[in-house]
Amino acid sequence: MMPLAMAKTGETVIIRKITGRDDVRQHLAELGFVVDSQVTVVSEAAGNLILQVKDSRIALSKAMATRIMF
C-alpha cells in the first residue's frame, strides 16, 4: 500500500486503508474518504491535493493525504 500523497495527477485509486486517530478517520469519512471508494487526483497546488471523491472536489493537505492508503 502507498499513501494517497504519492498518487500522480490524473490517477484514480481505490482507498484500501485510512490511518490515524478515530476523530481524523471520522472527519475523512464525512468528506467521503471511505475504504473501497475511488478517488481521483485532479491537481496539486501549494502543498495540497485537489481530489475528486464521488461528485465532489475536495482540497486535502499532503499531511492528511498521507493517512489515506491505496
Predicted regions mapped to residue ranges:
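Compact, glycine-rich, soluble single-domain proteins
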Residues: 1-70
